[in-house]
Regions:
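Active-site capping/gating regions of soluble enzymes
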Residues: 8-152
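Short, small-residue-biased leader/transition segments that mark boundaries at the very start
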Residues: 1-3
């Protein structure tokens, strides 16, 4: 799929992701994989960091849901998004906006850095910051949990 630090447009991201999803599901079908037993972990449809036009939260959500609607079979029970180098705030807002759409799947998150970044920054390796870091992590986890039901 697209590498985030490039200059591709959101439309190029859509096209590349579409082709990739088609190949993935062709291979899953060819190998008789039960789609009811998978969780898809795709990227969101984003502009590259170096692209002069950065898509809005709403545009990212619309393009991502549209791409998935066309290329992901309804038998897939869930889609867990990677943050793909987005800021923790953008990853959460994009997920929230996508969950405003009616889809065939549960849309959730599988974030590493985007879930942990604020806690790690708050902690900064100092024992006296542990409680504040834990609170920052819980706050981010709650926000992403709310985003799975468009609750922000």
């Amino acid at each position: 799929m697209c590498i985030r630090d490039r200059s591709h447009t959101i439309d190029e991201s859509f096209d590349i992701t579409s082709r990739t999803l088609n190949m993935v599901f062709d291979q899953l079908d060819e190998n008789n994989v039960s789609l009811q037993g998978i969780v898809l972990k795709p990227n969101m449809i984003l502009s590259g960091y170096s692209c002069s036009y950065q898509a809005s939260i709403e545009e990212v959500a619309e393009k991502t849901v549209n791409c998935l609607s066309v290329h992901v079979p309804s038998e897939v029970p869930g889609i867990a998004f990677l943050s793909g180098g987005q800021s923790d705030e953008h990853a959460t807002l994009h997920l929230n906006e996508m969950n405003k759409y009616e889809t065939d799947w549960n849309l959730t998150f599988s974030y590493g850095r985007a879930l942990q970044q604020s806690a790690l920054k708050t902690w900064s390796g100092k024992i006296e910051n542990v409680t504040d870091a834990q609170e920052a992590f819980i706050e981010k986890a709650k926000a992403n949990s709310l985003a799975t039901v468009a609750g922000l």
